[in-house]
A protein has these predicted regions:
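Short, structured interface segments
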Residues: 32-44, 298-311
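Active-site alpha-helix of zinc metalloproteases
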Residues: 99, 165, 323-328, 336
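Soluble catalytic regions of large protease machineries
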Residues: 327-329, 336-499
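Walker A/P-loop NTP-binding motif of AAA+ ATPase domains
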Residues: 55-268, 385, 400
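Conserved C-terminal "switch" segment of AAA+ ATPases
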Residues: 204, 223-224, 237-302, 316-319, ...
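Short pre-active-site segment immediately N-terminal to the catalytic Zn-binding motif
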Residues: 313-328, 370
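Active-site phosphate-binding and catalytic loops of NTP-dependent enzymes
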Residues: 85-92, 203-208, 315-321, 344-350, ...
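N-terminal accessory segments that target, anchor, or regulate ATP-driven/P-loop NTPase machines
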Residues: 1-50, 409-412
Length: 499
């Protein structure tokens, strides 16, 4: 309001002076220069107030609304009990909890956990991103940290609450190790102010503040931020396992009409490596596909199509040439043959429908969730990755760039084998291993597996030719139909129609 009054008074004054015959040009030039200086000097940024994002719906989110993170939820609830029952904690001489750090990959529900924590303690909730605090002008970040804590206290008092929760996403942006940003002390000043504010949190305050940070790079954080008395709890929020994925799918499909044939357990098995955000997107995409098809329920085909879309992206509008499609079909059948030899029944779908950056792909039914890999498992994975290019070479006497992503992944796995002591170099130190020795070890591993795959597929050239011809005609082959064709059974199965 004061801004509008000032502008009105200035305009009225200028009109009055103009009527009195005063030359206004010098005043206009001076005003323009002052405005330009104000914007370029950073004064505008310094004077601009900072406001965190207040979430009125935070109190509506509970831990029961979050699936797939049972261990993380249990650890957070245990920590929050010190705040809920602060009097009992004080009697035992327990230091008040000031900060909780949630560490884990993107999309695993760290923000939801923070909101549920606020609801659990009956606290006001305010959120900010680490990138909002750092500017090119010195002092801005520290000023915004002070404003954030002040806003949290005022918000709690406004709603007659004794607790406030501040959530800082991507906290590694402002909490990175000091001294790494040469020539830019703004980062260090911002972090110092955050440390000061957290040290100033007292159990005797009218409003008790809990700071919850989220990051996927704990290794980048300054040690001072992680010491006891600041972030007292570091809780890992990992990708959900199969049971966790099933819980998340049940939550996100609770408001959607599912066809009786939809098996959520099967979908959970096929989505190894999916985060909670991926699974929410999967359920939403399946509903969109059902809507487009005019269906009243979500069918298995909608979920199959949605899995492909989440993993690989939208279908491409541009259609490859017939020559390219033949090569893609041979490439994918090469993958499929080796996959079926390694683990019979592993192929779910093979298709030459372009999607995302892939001209075709083979989707497997994942094994049980595993977090350790043996040498044999890694070698078999290398064989599967190499098989597409070898199939192309056997039928077309040349390779294509379509295998480049396979080779990148194969090289990564071969390096993993070297660093795990699975090469002829034995146990090595990854940091001191010369690059030329690493390159030779990786090359030997890949050459050995390539020779094994070539020997295997040379005896299956006719199978590749026959099955790829069927794939060209149908564009998609379900795993059961593929296995019939490999076995030489040409009796057609009932087609599996994917949305």
């Amino acid at each position: 309001m004061s801004k509008e009054i000032t502008i009105g008074v200035a305009i009225a004054t200028m009109i009055f002076l103009a009527l009195q015959g005063v030359n206004l040009l010098p005043f206009l030039l001076l005003g323009a220069l002052s405005y330009l200086f104000y914007n370029l000097s950073g004064l505008k940024v310094l004077n601009k107030g900072f406001q965190g994002q207040v979430s009125p719906r935070a109190r509506e989110i509970t831990f029961a609304d979050i699936g797939g993170q049972e261990k993380a939820k249990q650890e957070i609830i245990e920590a929050l009990e010190f705040i809920k029952d602060s009097s009992a904690a004080e009697q035992l001489g327990i230091r008040p909890l000031k900060g909780i750090l949630l560490a884990g990959p993107p999309g695993t529900g760290k923000t939801l956990l923070a909101k549920a924590a606020a609801a659990y303690t009956g606290a006001s909730f305010i959120a900010a991103a680490g990138s909002e605090f750092v500017e090119m002008y010195a002092g801005v970040g520290a000023q915004r940290i002070r404003a954030l804590f002040k806003q949290a206290r005022e918000l709690a008092k406004q709603h007659n609450r004794k607790n406030a929760t501040i959530f800082i996403d991507e906290i590694d942006v402002l909490g990175g190790k000091r001294g790494q940003h040469s020539g830019h002390l703004e980062y260090d000043q911002t972090l110092n102010q955050l440390l000061v504010e957290m040290d100033g949190i007292s159990p005797n305050d009218d409003v008790r503040i809990l700071v919850i940070g989220a990051t996927n790079r704990v290794d980048l954080l300054d040690e001072a931020l992680l010491r006891p008395g600041r972030f007292d709890r570091i809780i890992q929020v990992e990708l959900p396992d199969r049971e966790g994925r099933l819980q998340i799918l049940k939550i996100h499909t609770a408001n959607k009409p599912l066809d009786p044939e939809v098996n959520l357990e099967s979908i959970a098995s096929q989505t190894f490596g999916f985060s909670g955000a991926h699974l929410e997107s999967l359920a939403n995409e399946a509903a969109i596909l059902a809507f487009r098809a005019g269906e009243k329920t979500l069918k298995p085909g909608h979920f199959n199509e949605a899995i492909d879309k989440v993993m690989l992206g939208e279908k491409m509008d541009r259609q490859p040439s017939e020559k390219e499609l033949k090569r893609v079909a041979v490439h994918e059948i090469g993958h499929a043959l080796v996959s079926e030899r390694i683990r019979p029944g592993s192929v779910s779908i093979v298709t030459i429908v372009p999607r995302g950056s892939a001209l075709g792909y083979m989707r497997e039914v994942p094994e049980d969730d595993s977090y350790l890999q043996t040498r044999r498992q890694l070698e078999e994975r290398l064989q599967l990755l190499i098989a597409g290019a070898i199939a192309e070479e056997l039928l077309f006497h040349s390779r294509s760039t379509g295998a480049s992503s396979d080779f990148i992944e194969a090289a990564r796995l071969a390096k993993k084998m070297v660093f795990a002591g699975m090469s002829d170099l034995g146990i090595v130190d990854p940091e001191s291993l010369p690059r030329h020795l690493l390159h030779r070890a990786v090359a030997r591993i890949l050459q050995t597996q390539e020779a094994l795959v070539r020997k295997e597929l040379q005896d299956k050239v006719e199978i590749i030719r026959r099955v790829s011809k069927e794939l060209l005609q149908e564009e998609k082959l379900a795993g059961e139909r593929l296995r019939q064709l490999i076995a030489g059974e040409d009796k057609p199965l009932e087609r599996v129609h994917l949305a």
